[in-house]
Amino acid sequence: MQEENQHPEQDDISEAQDAGAAGSLDARIAELEAQLAEQQANVLYVKAEGENIRRRAAEDIDKARKFALEKFSSELLAVKDSLDAALVVENATVESYKSGVELTAKQLLSVFEKFHITEINPLGEKFDPNKHQAISMLESDQEPNSVISVLQNVRPE
């Protein structure tokens, strides 16, 4: 017991150091908690901003698609008008119908060109599944796996 009380000043200093260290640790913990809260708020902000960007991009894509479809549709109306005009002609000859259909086909091709839809003619080419769609396989005098008949020859570029 005597040894415990021999250096009371040392005990006071040790307790003071411990109290100072605890206060310093409490301050450091409070500082780190504040930084953590700030970073969590930043994460939430960045996440919300990312969602806003995705939403705006989706809206822009929808608007562009709608505008393109409206423009394409309005261009096709002129083709439909030409076809309707051919239906109301009385006493038309086969030659006049043929001429009208040719002009209407040119009008339609013009619309296709305007919207980058091109006409292709793969007859005789080797079948490419990336460009062509096969309906069936038929025996032919042509090279094996080549296109021998075309049902649709217009496609987007």
UniProtKB/Swiss-Prot annotation:
Residues 1-21 are annotated as: Disordered. It is found in: Cytoplasm. InterPro entries: GrpE, GrpE_coiled_coil, GrpE_head. Disulfide bonds: none annotated. Keywords: Chaperone, Cytoplasm, Stress response. The keyword Chaperone applies. Pfam families: GrpE. It comes from the Bacteria. GO terms for biological process: protein folding. GO terms for molecular function: adenyl-nucleotide exchange factor activity; protein homodimerization activity; protein-folding chaperone binding; unfolded protein binding. GO terms for cellular component: cytosol. Residues 1-10 have a biased composition (Basic and acidic residues). Participates actively in the response to hyperosmotic and heat shock by preventing the aggregation of stress-denatured proteins, in association with DnaK and GrpE. It is the nucleotide exchange factor for DnaK and may function as a thermosensor. Unfolded proteins bind initially to DnaJ; upon interaction with the DnaJ-bound protein, DnaK hydrolyzes its bound ATP, resulting in the formation of a stable complex. GrpE releases ADP from DnaK; ATP binding to DnaK triggers the release of the substrate protein, thus completing the reaction cycle. Homodimer. Belongs to the GrpE family. NCBIfam families: PRK14139.1. This is Protein GrpE. It comes from Methylovorus sp. (strain SS1 / DSM 11726). The gene is grpE.
